Amino acid sequence: MNNTVVITGGVSGIGLSASQLFLSRGWNVVMADFNDALGQDVHRKLSTQYGADRVAFHQCDVSDADSVNNLAEAAYQQFGHVDSVINNAGIFAKGAVHELDESTWDRVMATDVKSIFLTTKAFVPDMIERKSGTIVNTASISGLQGDYNMAVYNAAKGAVVNLVRAMALDYGKYGIRVNNVNPGPTLTPMFKSNPESVIDEFAQASPLGRLVEPDDVARTMFFLASDESAPITGENIPVSAGFEIYSGQPVQQ
């Protein structure tokens, strides 16, 4: 029996790379995304490539409890079990705290943090009963350090950075492992919409002189979801090309 993974934000960027990788490794994949048109298109393509019996798409608002519960019901109905949940859906907003309105703050927190609360409530009870399962959250190096002009994103990802520890402690006794991937600047369609000069600046700031590819993050997600990472739980794993390792102090001569 194939393993089954649910991937939120699963039809573009890092999520799409993860969906393709898990399918290529023999897993069943349930993709969830707010973008219904894109999701249906991706589903058609992946169904042709991997088989309609192994891949599903469900339109989902991960900040809404009913929508997440409907996703879980559909996943269990089609595949019978869920072995891993990849909480990848997320948004960001720019601005210092005083520049943000309340609705923007609430929207980012609901999508980036509350969504993990909702998917956990929907999927963990079955994992507890089966005494097995993995959860992988997409955090960010922005949760490990501060950024200019990104207060709510820093706050949201900082919450995810510590939430993983609490979840790992609570669910370890049931054989459930919980970890985060913490990407640095990643060449997703959204990031590539920046001017080329900005993208070049980011690449030059990396000790490796490169940016992260979505496939880099997807491979780490697969590792954390699989038995290959059996002793690892409660960890934040940077996939950043080294962006988070520099203190920012001037070079000493």
Model-identified regions with their sequence ranges:
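Conserved glycine-rich cofactor-binding loop
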Residues: 11-12
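Short, small/polar-rich loop/turn modules that mediate ligand/substrate recognition or access, typified
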Residues: 86, 172, 177, 232-234
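Substrate-binding pocket helix/loop in short-chain dehydrogenase/reductase
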Residues: 96-97, 101-106, 191, 202
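Active-site helix of classical SDR
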Residues: 120, 156, 164
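Alpha-helical segment proximal to the catalytic Tyr-Lys
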Residues: 125, 169-173, 230
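Residue(s) in the substrate-gating loop at a strand-loop-helix junction
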Residues: 140
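Short C-terminal tail/terminal secondary-structure segment
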Residues: 145, 233-253
